[in-house]
C-alpha cells in the first residue's frame, strides 16, 4: 500500500475556519444635515371637557309623582 493510498483512506479534515471578513474602517453613522426640530402642534390641545357646575351641584332630577297622589280626594 503506497503512501498516497494511505492518505486517501484517512478521514477528510475539516476545512480551515475562515476569519470573519473585516471592513477597512467602521461604517460612519448616518448624520442629519441639522438636528430635527421637535414636532409642533398647530395650537395647544384643548383641555378635556369638565362637567358643568349645575351637573355637579344640582341633585338628580326626579319625576314628580302622578297628580292623583298629590290631589286630595274630591269631597261630595
UniProtKB/Swiss-Prot annotation:
Per UniProt, the keywords (alphabetical) are: Cytoplasm, Keratinization, Repeat
Question: Pfam families annotated for this entry?
Answer: SPRR2
Q: Name one GO cellular component term.
A: nucleus
Gene induction = Up-regulated by estrogen in the uterus of ovariectomized animals, with strongly increased expression detected in luminal epithelial cells at 6 and 12 hours after hormone injection.
Region 3 X 9 AA approximate tandem repeats: which residues? 21-47
What is known about the tissue distribution of this protein? Expressed in uterus.
Where do the sequence repeats lie? 21-29, 30-38, 39-47
Location of the protein in the cell: Cytoplasm
The record's region (Disordered) falls at 55-76
Q: What's a BP term from Gene Ontology annotated to this protein?
A: epidermis development
Spell out where the chain crosses the membrane.
none
Highest taxon of the lineage: Eukaryota
The family note in this entry says: Belongs to the cornifin (SPRR) family.
What's its job? Cross-linked envelope protein of keratinocytes. It is a keratinocyte protein that first appears in the cell cytosol, but ultimately becomes cross-linked to membrane proteins by transglutaminase. All that results in the formation of an insoluble envelope beneath the plasma membrane.
Would you tell me the protein name for this molecule?
A: Small proline-rich protein 2G
Amino acid at each position: 500500500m503506497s503512501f498516497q493510498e494511505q492518505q486517501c483512506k484517512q478521514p477528510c479534515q475539516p476545512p480551515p475556519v475562515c476569519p470573519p471578513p473585516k471592513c477597512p474602517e467602521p461604517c460612519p453613522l448616518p448624520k442629519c444635515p441639522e438636528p430635527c426640530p421637535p414636532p409642533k402642534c398647530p395650537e395647544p390641545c384643548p383641555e378635556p371637557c369638565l362637567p358643568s357646575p349645575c351637573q355637579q351641584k344640582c341633585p338628580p332630577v326626579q319625576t314628580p309623582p302622578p297628580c292623583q297622589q298629590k290631589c286630595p280626594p274630591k269631597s261630595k
